[in-house]
């Protein structure tokens, strides 16, 4: 219901993807949009480096977040330094967009990253648990690198969280939400879900 209330904009039928604008943005602008349109419903815990918005006539119709890899030291598999590697952390658009909207959006950000940063490779994951196999990545010349090992998520309310969310600390003290999740697991209000491996995709910027 939230997304219908906040984002009831419909792309005019005569619009083509090349009519859309991709703009550098920030998390404050896209937070509510992502929490409404991305399957994770969350940006909690993301380390964020670059944020982009996709616009049609100044209406936000898509959002994308890039940041360091979520798994500690995972960058070593792809680059010589952590700054070589950037992960596409979130991508979502409103439902009613023309064909190829997401691939157009990704392509624009790929070119921006190549021109404006020193990153050498983009890594992204297609979440098989949510039925994603990476069609959009294959359409934008990403290379399929295999699967991650199976994992597990914490289901709490209508959202899921990585199991590392219960271990996040600030100055050696559990963050409030981490403690809240732990309490929910103990009370039975939250539970673990076993998940299949995610599809790994990479795109070389240089």
Each model region followed by its residue ranges:
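Short amphipathic alpha-helix that is part of the acyltransferase structural core
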Residues: 4-46
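A short, polar/charged loop/turn motif at coil->beta-strand junctions and beta-hairpin connectors
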Residues: 16, 28, 60, 80-82, ...
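Conserved beta-hairpin
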Residues: 34, 48-68
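Short, P/G- and charge-enriched loop/turn segments at secondary-structure junctions
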Residues: 40-41, 184-191
């Amino acid at each position: 219901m939230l997304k219908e209330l906040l984002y009831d904009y419909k792309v005019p039928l005569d619009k083509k993807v090349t009519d859309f604008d991709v703009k550098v943005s920030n998390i404050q602008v896209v937070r509510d949009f992502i929490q409404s349109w991305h399957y994770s419903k969350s940006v909690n815990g993301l380390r964020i480096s670059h944020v982009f918005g996709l616009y049609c006539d100044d209406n936000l119709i898509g959002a994308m977040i890039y940041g360091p890899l979520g798994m500690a030291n995972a960058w070593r598999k792809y680059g010589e330094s952590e700054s070589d590697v950037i992960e596409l952390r979130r991508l979502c658009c409103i439902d009613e967009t023309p064909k190829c909207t997401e691939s157009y959006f990704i392509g624009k950000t790929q070119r921006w990253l190549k021109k404006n940063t020193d990153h050498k490779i983009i890594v992204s994951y297609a979440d098989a648990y949510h039925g994603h196999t990476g069609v959009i990545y294959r359409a934008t010349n990403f290379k399929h690198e295999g699967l991650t090992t199976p994992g597990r998520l914490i289901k709490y309310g209508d959202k899921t969280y990585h199991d590392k969310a219960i271990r996040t600390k600030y100055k050696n003290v559990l963050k409030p939400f981490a403690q809240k999740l732990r309490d929910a697991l103990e009370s039975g209000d939250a539970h673990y879900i076993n998940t299949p491996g995610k599809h790994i995709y990479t795109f070389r910027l240089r």
